[in-house]
């Protein structure tokens, strides 16, 4: 015969207990169990019971000295009826419409549909044409001005007003002196002859002639200008011998410029004059 008691005992001990994984009561108890509060903030959990056995009237025990003013006000319930709106009349009966507060409108009772005025639609003044009627005009009449152009006069009216202004200008007579011989003409009207500078025109220059770039790149205009300067120096009248001074030793030491042909011609022309001039009485002192 088989021992059934041993098999049942072995089957029951084959699985490990699951007490560490979950707690499942064998039978639902009918006794009421106190659940933890939904929130730790006083007043947000079950308001029927106060913490530490105090009643709702003794909420001063919740406020601590270390709390801020905002926390103290929140623990005491805040301002009464802060977010409530009380409609006029009784709350019992048919529901009433939402009434506007007194501070939002000027009168306590809103106007009915018959009392409401229809807003008048008006057009801007510059879009309305109204003929001027002198019979209805008063002293305070002002013509309507446009949105941009404020000049209501015609060109003929403007010209007539300008002519009247010119005529109204006071013109003083010229002051005539009793002694015209002693009074000289002012220098402001006529400039003296010495103050005006006049430059001779450059010979051979044509303002209308186009620029030759090949001549410009090859320094052709430079050579032409140097030749014109040499020709103008040759045509200039020669100064007398008395006005020509002997060359200084510094001028003799300076080398001649090979690019300036006008300097060579001037040196050639001044050489016979300088040789004919008598030698100076005293030699100049050499510069240190």
Swiss-Prot record:
UniProt region (Disordered), positions on chain: 31-52, 179-288
Listed name of the protein: Uncharacterized protein C7orf57 homolog
Annotated Basic and acidic residues bias: 221-236
Biased composition (Polar residues): 206-217
Superkingdom of the organism of origin: Eukaryota
Biased composition (Low complexity): 237-249, 267-276
InterPro entries according to UniProt: DUF5524
